[in-house]
Amino acid sequence: VGRIVVDSLTAAGEEVRVLSRGRRPQQATEVRHVVGDVQTGDGLDAALDGVDTIVHCVYPTEQLVAAAKRAGSPHLVYVSIVGIDRIPFVFYRMMLANERAIAESGLPWTVLRATQFHDLIAFLLRMLAKPPVIALPSGLRFQPVDVRDVGERLARLALGEPIGRAPDFGGPQARTLDELARSYLAVVGKRRPIAPIRLPGKVFGGIRAGGLLAPERAAGTITFEQYLNEQHTAGQRPYRDAIRAYLPLPHHRRKTSR
């Protein structure tokens, strides 16, 4: 999603910095790469100097918030996940704590919660489809969304005024995992029998109850099938960049005269 944010902001004529822990090749003349570590705080003061908006797409938050305060309180835009306050999953508790830290920081802020990315669902299905029979958790429902839709929305929020909690951003359709699995198998050309299994526990119960859905906020435009077919037509595995997509880097927009 971070790459989409960068592309959208540069297309809008903004000067963009990309923060990473190591030097990266320059991908465009409009983008400046800076070195810093949001986990330790190293390099953040220099990276944030002169920045008026931060789009934060990774999970460590404490050091970034502290550095942002020292930098003059830029607008902090954070991408989070729909349902983190409804599903008792450890990682979601961490995300919720990050949201609270941002909201209580005194910084101008905007938080956008999005439903699960197509990449993550495709990666999950790839793992499940490796054995000759797919043991598929039954009753789970997702509303997968494309990173392009979310990235473009984040860029628009970054260009606007801070609004606190933005309306949730969901994919175009809420689907069962069984439906998504059959679409995945059809596109990648695999034949696998599906054996439904019911997983116990509050996490899976919450997902079955729709805890990860935002049906009233179906703002995404790219369906899971469109995503899969695009990847297949391009000769790419639909899940290839899934993990990389979930480990993006924070992006910073410098002050510009408008």
Model-based region annotation:
Residues 3-22, 26-31, 39-41, 71-74, ...:
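Oxidoreductase cofactor-interface core, primarily capturing Rossmann-like NAD(P)-dependent enzymes
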Residues 10, 48-49, 53, 66, ...:
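N-terminal Rossmann-like NAD(P)+-binding domain of SDR-like oxidoreductases, especially those catalyzing
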Residues 45, 65, 147-155, 221-228, ...:
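Short, amphipathic alpha-helical "lid/cap" segments that border enzyme active or binding sites
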